[in-house]
A protein has these predicted regions:
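Short glycine-aspartate micro-motif
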Residues: 1, 80-85, 155-159, 182
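Phosphate-binding/catalytic loop of phosphoryl-transfer enzymes
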Residues: 96-104, 111-115, 119-203, 374
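Phosphate/ATP-binding catalytic cores across multiple sugar-kinase/actin-like superfamilies
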Residues: 62-70, 268-295
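Conserved ATP-utilizing enzyme core subdomain
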Residues: 4, 8-31, 178-279, 283, ...
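Active-site metal-binding loops of divalent metal-dependent hydrolases
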Residues: 4, 89, 162, 304-306
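Short glycine/proline- and acidic residue-enriched helix-loop micro-motifs
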Residues: 40-55, 202-208, 261-264
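Catalytic phosphate/nucleotide-handling subdomain of diverse soluble enzymes
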Residues: 7-18, 170-172, 194, 280-370
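Short beta-strand-loop/turn "lid" adjacent to the catalytic site in phosphate-handling enzymes
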Residues: 45-108
């Protein structure tokens, strides 16, 4: 798995016949030059087809490096692996265009990945849902539902990757009336990381320490919260197509004007405001869903953002100050024995398993697709 944060490739080995406990993991960071190219491909540019094809090859090589190294460390031959679920790197996500079927693009040369690993590769999971007029995202709520199936009470899961998405898992006692809900809430780490790198040279704000030194700029926060996406009802999905560095700078200019002499918040204050944006939009989504559905008893946070201590503290504080959400037990997936950075990679192992079995893996109540569909294509080794 390589997500919107574009920090690298997360590989995880999972025996889905014996529950969901991961056996091993390995991470390969993206080389800076590849990350630069992938970020540029999020917006139109010259010679895109050629650049995209070469980038897809490089992504496949990094995936293969992660898989082969993980298996070597475990002493496991490729023949032991039933399938490799590979997401690829999203560079465009436009699931609906003027009411017509849109597209979603995850760069990955799956044939090359198959060749380099000797393992069957399941990939391109989002396209089938988009073809069925769905959003193609988020796909993880269906996996979250399987992962937390043993919990009788209603569970909410926030996945803080580059983008934040919410999974709402009602109690199983509802039977046929039970409907899993999920949608993208807005930016999680994507803007925080971009601003941090731009102003400190660091790829991310470790533990939110830099943001914690700043003050929330409420006029800027109001400007950011006015983004129409936050007020759209689900099903909905988003990504770097909307929330990128250019969007943030446009919001700053709209709030403070183009004149550099106009007083602006410090870079640290902007970081604090972006952290508040993530916490607020996440909780706004949880609150709205609480009013539409059976109230959740637990709020589980996963993804890289769950490692941001300051952000987690702010999320908990906002919950405690909200009468509708004060009862929520807020925790990270690590407190449930599942590493926060492993959940999404595990989801694509599960999606690969569903593809090999020929079983449906989307949740139409989440994506808005016309019905349940078998997701992904398969390259045989």
């Amino acid at each position: 798995m390589s997500g919107t944060s574009m920090d690298g490739v997360d590989a995880v080995l999972v025996d889905l016949g014996a529950g969901f406990a991961p056996e091993a993991e390995y991470h390969v960071p993206y080389p800076p030059e590849l990350k630069r190219i992938l970020l540029e491909l999020n917006t139109p540019g010259p010679n895109e087809l050629h650049v995209s094809a070469l980038a897809a090859n490089e992504v496949a090589r990094l995936y293969a490096q992660a898989v082969n190294t993980l298996l070597k460390h475990q002493g496991r031959p490729a023949r032991d692996i039933v399938a490799l679920g590979a997401h690829g790197q999203t560079v465009r996500h436009q699931p609906a265009l003027g009411g017509e079927v849109g597209y979603t693009t995850q760069l990955l040369n799956a044939a090359l990945l198959c060749e380099l690993t000797g393992i069957d590769v399941a990939y391109d999971f989002r396209a089938r849902d988009v073809a069925a007029r769905g959003q193609g995202a988020p796909l993880v709520p269906a996996f979250h539902d399987a992962l937390f199936a043993q919990h009788e009470a209603s569970v909410a899961v926030l996945n803080w990757g580059g983008i934040c998405n919410l999974s709402w898992l009602p109690p199983r006692s509802l039977g046929s009336e039970r409907v899993v809900v999920g949608f993208d809430c807005g930016p999680a780490n994507v803007l925080l990381d971009a601003w941090c790198e731009e102003h400190t040279g660091l790829p991310f704000d470790r533990d939110g320490l830099w943001a914690a030194q700043g003050q929330i700029h409420h006029a800027l926060l109001d400007q950011l919260l006015a983004e129409p996406y936050f007020h759209r009802p689900p099903p909905k999905s988003t990504g770097r197509d909307l929330f990128h560095r250019g969007w943030l700078h446009a919001q700053l200019e709209s709030c403070f004007g183009a004149d550099p002499r106009t007083p602006r918040p410090s870079a640290c204050d902007v970081q604090a405001t972006l952290m508040e944006l993530t916490a607020r939009t996440s909780l706004d989504a949880v609150r709205a869903q609480s009013q539409r559905s059976v109230a959740a008893q637990s709020l589980i946070v996963c993804g890289g953002g769950a490692n941001n201590t300051a952000l987690m503290k702010r999320l908990s504080a906002l919950c405690q100050s909200d009468p509708l959400l004060a009862h929520l037990q807020v925790s990270t997936s690590a407190q449930w024995g599942l590493g926060v950075h492993l959940i999404e990679a595990m989801a694509f192992a599960w999606l690969a398993c569903q593809r090999v079995r020929g079983e449906c893996a989307n949740a139409p109540s989440v994506t808005g697709a016309l019905g349940h569909r078998v997701l992904g294509a398969l390259v045989k080794a």
